[in-house]
UniProtKB/Swiss-Prot annotation:
Keyword Zinc-finger: no
Region called Disordered, residue ranges: 134-160
GO BP field: trans-translation
Protein name, UniProt field: SsrA-binding protein
HAMAP family per UniProt: SmpB
Entry GO CC: cytosol
Function: Required for rescue of stalled ribosomes mediated by trans-translation. Binds to transfer-messenger RNA (tmRNA), required for stable association of tmRNA with ribosomes. tmRNA and SmpB together mimic tRNA shape, replacing the anticodon stem-loop with SmpB. tmRNA is encoded by the ssrA gene; the 2 termini fold to resemble tRNA(Ala) and it encodes a 'tag peptide', a short internal open reading frame. During trans-translation Ala-aminoacylated tmRNA acts like a tRNA, entering the A-site of stalled ribosomes, displacing the stalled mRNA.
Molecular function in Gene Ontology: RNA binding
Lineage, opening ranks: Bacteria, Pseudomonadati, Pseudomonadota, Gammaproteobacteria, Oceanospirillales
Subcellular location: Cytoplasm
Similarity-based family: Belongs to the SmpB family.
InterPro entries from the UniProt entry: SmpB, SsrA-bd_prot, SsrA-bd_prot_CS
Gene3D superfamilies with a match to the protein in the record: 2.40.280.10
C-alpha cells in the first residue's frame, strides 16, 4: 500500500495586504490561472508577490498584470523566464460580464487579493473594489488600533 502524498491544499501562496487597506471590497471572485511549468514550481516554493498588481479586462478576457513570480534557477534553465509577464485569468463568462459591467462604472476596479492552492491547482482570489479616500484609510487604522487595545485589556484582565 502506498503512502498518501502530503498535499498543501488550501494553503495561501501570496497575499495582497495593500489592496485590503487601499480599497473597499465590493465582491470577491475565484479565478484560475494559466501558468507555465517553471511558474508552478516557483509558486510551490512561495516565490510570488502581488503588491501593485491589478486585473485588466480586455476583449472579454481577464489578465493579471504586475504579479511578480521569481523564477527558480533549477526550474527555468531551458526557458527565458519573464517574472512579470501578463497571465490569463480563467473565469466563467457570466463572472466576466459582471466584472466588465461593474468596472465600466466610475470608481470601480478589479485587483487580486490572494494566490492559493485548491487541490493541485493555483487559484487567484480577485475582488471588485472601490477606492478609499484618505480619511477612510485613517478610520480603518484607528479601528485596528482600537481592536488591539481591547485585546490587550482583555488579555491583561484575564491574567489577573
Amino acid at each position: 500500500m502506498s503512502q498518501a502524498k502530503n498535499k498543501n491544499t488550501g494553503s495561501t501562496i501570496a497575499l495582497n495586504k495593500k489592496a485590503r487597506f487601499d480599497y473597499h471590497i465590493v465582491e470577491k471572485f475565484e479565478a484560475g490561472l494559466a501558468l507555465t511549468g517553471w511558474e508552478v514550481k516557483s509558486l510551490r516554493a512561495g516565490k510570488c508577490q502581488l503588491v501593485d498588481s491589478y486585473v485588466l479586462l480586455k476583449d472579454s478576457e481577464a489578465w493579471l498584470l504586475g504579479a511578480h513570480i521569481t523564477p527558480l534557477k533549477e526550474a527555468s534553465t531551458h526557458v527565458i523566464a519573464d517574472p512579470t509577464r501578463t497571465r490569463k485569468l480563467l473565469l466563467h463568462r457570466r463572472e466576466l460580464n459582471k466584472l466588465i459591467g461593474a468596472v465600466s462604472q466610475t470608481g470601480h476596479t478589479c485587483v487580486p487579493l490572494a494566490l492559493y492552492w485548491k487541490g493541485n491547482k493555483v487559484k487567484c482570489e480577485i475582488a471588485l473594489v472601490k477606492g478609499k479616500k484618505d480619511f477612510d484609510k485613517r478610520e480603518t487604522e484607528k479601528e485596528r488600533d482600537w481592536n488591539r487595545q481591547k485585546q490587550r485589556v482583555i488579555r491583561d484582565h484575564v491574567k489577573q
